[in-house]
């Protein structure tokens, strides 16, 4: 098995256990309830994005049953994000310690996608889809910045194209930003002479 897959599986199991401790959002949750809460958590993270500059909403999210709308669980989004970041920094595994928040979230990309599919029918989309809807076309649930954790081989060609085009656009944007920063720093150095 690939080392990257092993690490993703370890992150998946370890983070579920970490969030399952007493007074945490997954405590006592199993099966379909556990999956629905994870889908909600990672869909909400995907909506805002995993940049270090992202300020997550400090509000309680209730996860409700699809059948009878009973509350299955609830969590504070900002607190859960802080717990995930604490998991990363306090892990005894040096490979997990070195991961970015985005890389930790990649292990839960399928849950994010599943949650985003449900939200799509309620008119809720990720910030990435909102800024580039032409790239997402019919698959807005694939437009999030940790979609690298999705298995491209179980997608159709149109879905693969959405992910490829989105990641290409993000790379172009990052490259343009770094070029502008380099130009600005050379201008400011010239002024100091």
UniProtKB/Swiss-Prot annotation:
<dbReference type="Pfam" id="PF05892">
    <property type="entry name" value="Tricho_coat"/>
</dbReference>
<keyword id="KW-1139">Helical capsid protein</keyword>
<keyword id="KW-0946">Virion</keyword>
<dbReference type="InterPro" id="IPR008879">
    <property type="entry name" value="Coat_protein_tricho/vitivirus"/>
</dbReference>
<keyword id="KW-0167">Capsid protein</keyword>
<dbReference type="GO" id="GO:0019029">
    <property type="term" value="C:helical viral capsid"/>
</dbReference>
<protein>
    <recommendedName>
        <fullName>Capsid protein</fullName>
    </recommendedName>
</protein>
